[in-house]
UniProtKB/Swiss-Prot annotation:
Pfam assignment, any one: NADHdh
InterPro entries assigned to the protein according to its UniProt record, in alphabetical order: NADH_UbQ_OxRdtase_su1/FPO, NADH_UbQ_OxRdtase_su1_CS
Protein localization: Cell inner membrane
Keywords from the UniProt entry: Cell inner membrane, Cell membrane, Membrane, NAD, Quinone, Translocase, Transmembrane, Transmembrane helix, Ubiquinone
Family statement: Belongs to the complex I subunit 1 family.
First-tier enzyme category under EC: translocase
Protein name: NADH-quinone oxidoreductase subunit H
GO terms of biological process kind: aerobic respiration
Transmembrane segments: 11-31, 50-69, 81-101, 114-134, 154-174, 186-206, 237-257, 265-285, 304-324
Amino acid sequence: MSWITPDLIEILLSILKAVVILLVVVTCGAFMSFGERRLLGLFQNRYGPNRVGWGGSLQLVADMIKMFFKEDWVPKFSDRVIFTLAPMIAFTSLLLSFAIVPVSPNWVVADLNIGILFFLMMAGLAVYAVLFAGWSSNNKYSLLGAMRASAQTVSYEVFLGLSLMGVVAQAGSFNMTDIVNNQAHLWNVIPQFFGFVTFAIAGVAVCHRHPFDQPEAEQELADGYHIEYSGMKFGLFFVGEYIGIVTVSALMVTLFFGGWHGPFLPPFVWFALKTAFFMMMFILIRASLPRPRYDQVMSFGWKVCLPLTLINLLVTAAVILWQAQ
C-alpha cells in the first residue's frame, strides 16, 4: 500500500510504545498501593488487607469499584474549574515524566536530547497542580498544605537538579540513553555516590513521601491539599503519587545503576528488577522513619543537601578537567 510510509510506521510505533508504557506505569502504581499496605502490615506485625479474594488478591479491584462509585463532590465556595484541573495536571505531569526513561536499548517513548531537563520541567509543573488544589478548595488546611508542598518541592528540586549535573558532566549529554550507555562498564553510583544519595533524598521529598510528607500530615493538616477531593479526582492524586514513586525509582536505575545493563537476563528484566527494588525501598523508608518537623525538613535541605551537591559537582568538574589534561 502506497500510503504506508516509513514515517507513518514510526509514528504508529511511537504511539504503541506510549500506550504500552502508560498502561504498565499506571498498573504498577496501582499495584504498588496494594503491595505497600501488605508490606506495611508485615513490617508492623499485623495482617494488612486480606479479606477480598484469596489472601487479599482482589483488594485492588474492590478499591477501584469503590472509587468509581464515590460521589464526585465539589465544595460550594470553591473555584470549580481550577478544582477540577488540579488533579488532571498532577496526574498528567507525573505520567509524562516517565516518557523519557529508556526501558531497554530500543524501547523509549521520547528519546529527547534534553531528557533530564524535561523531567525537571514536569516535576516543576506538578507544583502548580498542588497550588491549584490548595487554593481552589477554599479551605485553610488545604491551602496550608499546598504552601508547604510548593515550598518543599521547589526547594528540593534545586538539590534534585544539582545532584544530576555530575552525571550529565560525566556522560557529556542530557540524553537518558547516552547516560545509560556511558555506564556499560561502571555504574554512576560509584563515582557519583554523593550525587545518588542527594537524588534519593530529594526524590522522596518531591514525591511527598514519608518522612517528607508534611504537606499532607494527617495529625496536623487533616490530609493537606486534597482534603476536599473525593471520587475519581482524589483517585488521580492518589495514583499519581505512586506513579511518581515508580518514575523516581526508574530514574535512579537509569541515572546511577546502569539502566538495563546486567548479565544473563534480558535488558527489560534487569530494568524491572532494579526498579522494583527501589520501589520496595520507598515502602521500607515509610515503615522505618519518623516524620520530622517541617522546619527541620527545610533546614536539612538547605544546610546538608545543598552543600553536599555543590561539593559533589565541584569534585566531579575537577576530576574531569584533570583527566582531560
